[in-house]
Amino acid sequence: MSVAKANVVWVLDYLNNQLAMIVRSSHQASGIDFLTPDNYGQQVAYMNRPKGEVIQAHIHEPISRTLIGTQEVLYIRKGRIRVDFYESDRTYVSSMILGAGDLMLLSTGGHGFEVLEDIDMIEIKQGPFAEGRDKTRFLPEPHEIRYSDESPN
């Protein structure tokens, strides 16, 4: 299940928990648009600033934050990829296609990918990666995968 608003799509599980947020390359807004809720470990904001505007120099103060779990941000620089979304109990929810310029925040649940075209992709997440403790791999049922092969852009 998904909910879209102005080229921002929230992927929801069957209990309306947010599994992911996709910001399509065509998304636009005025000024600063904070897209994620305040309780997320990663904050995503869209900014539209005019030429010549000055953003005052600043530092980020060390603030203690407690994070449980891992949230990933993926930015697709080129190509296309299918993302399969799962609930935390590994129940398949839905799939979506991402293309060049799309950004996705994976907030909870599970996910898998199939590369549809050669991709260049950047991944951002809390680190460092805890090898052997950070993820549990599983084999989905291929017949469950449902998606439309429409170009996202």
Region locations from a protein language model:
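Glycine- and acidic-residue-biased ligand/ion/polar-headgroup-sensing regions
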Residues: P50-K51, G69-D84
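Short acidic-glycine-tyrosine-enriched beta hairpin
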Residues: E87-T108
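Double-stranded beta-helix
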Residues: G112-N153
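Conserved short histidine dyad/triad with adjacent acidic residue
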Residues: A29, M47-I68
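Short, surface-exposed beta-strand-loop junctions and turns on beta-sheet-rich folds
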Residues: I63-S64, D89-T91, D120, P128-A130
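A short, N-terminal "cap"/entry segment at the start of jelly-roll beta-barrel domains
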Residues: M1-M47, E141, D149-N153
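Short beta-strand His + acidic residue motifs that chelate non-heme Fe in jelly-roll/DSBH
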Residues: A57, V83-D84, M104-L106, H111-L116, ...
